[in-house]
Amino acid sequence: MTEKKRVLILEHILENPAGRVGAILDEYEIFYHLIHVGRDRLPDPTRYNAIIVLGGSAHVYDKHRYPYTVREEAYLHQAIKQGIPCLGICLGGQLLANAFKAEVKKLPKVHIGFLEIHFTEEGNRDPLSLQGLCRSPASFSMA
């Protein structure tokens, strides 16, 4: 019998649970553990096969208002160094980038929705790069 996959989901807003991510994991019968980063203790990342970091209203460049992001970035940096795949969505992507000293800067105006993504050579080789999604038509609908 094969061991069930375990995914850790890090959420930032209590009213913003796993949503579609949780539904997809449920569909594939993948166990997930959902924790709120600002409230819950971060578990040992080696207990999981992957980590998904959700969005939120925080910003990586606003650490005095969101001090938990410092701890979260260190946690994500260590998880990746231990070989655990991580996927960041919205704020989660900012946190992952910032954890590895990539430039994350404030947009001139608030943006909610989709932006075009460009991959580096290394990004193209990453199994979590979602290349197919990013090369799909410019618009699509989600249920």
Task: Go through the PLM ranges and name each one.
Residues 1, 24-26, 96, 109, ...:
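A generic structural signal for short, solvent-exposed coil/turn residues
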Residues 54-123:
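Cysteine-nucleophile active-site neighborhood
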Residues 18-21, 101-106, 124-131:
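Intrinsically disordered, low-complexity boundary segments flanking structured domains
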Residues 110-143:
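An acidic, glycine-rich "communication" segment
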Residues 1-82:
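N-terminal beta1-alpha1 cap of cysteine-dependent amidohydrolase-like domains
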Residues 35-37, 107, 142:
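Conserved beta-strand termini and adjacent loop/short-helix elements that scaffold enzyme active sites
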Residues 30-33, 103, 138:
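Conserved beta-strand segments of alpha/beta enzyme cores
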